[in-house]
């Protein structure tokens, strides 16, 4: 049975698992020359990864991860460290020079692109050894049951990855039927997950560096593709051992999941 999600975005129970990889890259929206990465996987990226696990068709699962019928919390488990990796790109413009082989009724005609030129060197900013704890709840019972079965059995229809298909991910420490317990904010509260607030709402701490991002959160299907309908602003701590501290005036609903305090969004 799928969990109910209340008006504050808190589910009655959820699935929890850890996802990690050697590398990760979540391309920032609006960047073209340098391939910069988000430090935290966007909510839409997590949705795509879970859809790959259950084998959902492209553009078919956006309603499952809507703003009101899904809840996701993301907790960094590793320090958010990046490196730049140069890669050589090869253009695919069909107007570029090509070479054709001779063909006849018994043979195929093959077309080869002239690869002696039109190469570009791109620098990819990638996360090194990223690891995240994901808590997820979905009201779509069929999808949720299939996801739970795959996670528990360690199977997937398509291999999960962290951003790029070559950055294959490992999923471990799966827990089911986790019941979040609502936490009261007594002056301040430390949150382990990323928190959907502005930087001005985070309480400063000595020797703790906060980061902020704005990334796609919810998408809808449209003819010929998809469209982002919501972006999330959130705060995270650069070091995995440090929490984000919030005050009692902060408009979020923190919950306890195991030994972690998280905020669903």
UniProtKB/Swiss-Prot annotation:
It is found in: Cytoplasm. One of its GO terms (biological process) is maintenance of CRISPR repeat elements. One of its GO terms (cellular component) is cytoplasm. Its main location: cytoplasm. Keywords: Antiviral defense, Cytoplasm, Plasmid. InterPro entries: CRISPR-assoc_prot_Cas5, CRISPR-assoc_prot_Cas5_HALMA, CRISPR-assoc_prot_Cas5_N. Disruption phenotype: Loss of the 8 Cas genes in this locus (cas1, cas2, cas3, cas4, cas5, cas6, cas7 and cas8b) leads to loss of CRISPR interference against plasmid targeted by this CRISPR locus, i.e. plasmid is not destroyed by CRISPR. CRISPR (clustered regularly interspaced short palindromic repeat) is an adaptive immune system that provides protection against mobile genetic elements (viruses, transposable elements and conjugative plasmids). CRISPR clusters contain sequences complementary to antecedent mobile elements and target invading nucleic acids. CRISPR clusters are transcribed and processed into CRISPR RNA (crRNA). Plasmid targeted by CRISPR locus P1 transform wild-type cells very poorly. There are 3 CRISPR RNA loci in this organism and a single cas gene locus. A CRISPR-Cas type I-B system. Component of the Cascade-like complex (Cascade I-B), composed of Cas5, Cas6, Cas7 and crRNA. This is CRISPR-associated protein Cas5. The gene is cas5.
